[in-house]
Amino acid sequence: MKVKARVVITPDKVVVGGKILIFESSGADLLVEIYKKKVGNYPKFFKMDPLARLGFIASELLLGEETPRKTDCEDRAVIFFNRSASLADDAEYQKTIGKDGFFPSPAVFVYTLPNIVTGEIAIRNKYYGETSFYVLEEKDDKVMKEIVEQAFQDPVTESAIAGWLECSDSEHFEAELYLIEK
């Protein structure tokens, strides 16, 4: 496996290909600013939950490093890991079904599965390969590498967007994604 590109996003730092990108915002506002300045052409972004926004933005920056950008393919996997799954959205959804008012929100419920973010990225880029989201007890580079290596055992898989995508709430998050080739 060969790493072709790397992106790191935290509430106050964005690193793409080893270069720090400067933005005025932080936290949730940072993701919106990056979207407006670097992506800006995917209206579904504003319907996404914080985890999906983080993964979407990180993948867009990561794929911006690829020349030419690869789309409409069956040989690219999307494999993410975190420790809290979609717990932030689960808590938001729980608020809509509390005893004080039973008004479940379908808009929030849609994002109560962490693998929604892998689907959003696959749909955006027309990737038809494996999409997986693994929940680990903690960030474990060795385990993540082993799982990605297993994905490459599929003879169809030639590349992957893979890495850590943790979002405990809209202000606290970490993305460390890699573009990897076989």
What does each model-found stretch correspond to?
Residues M1-K182:
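Conserved "HGTGT" condensation-loop signature of ketosynthase/thiolase-family condensing enzymes
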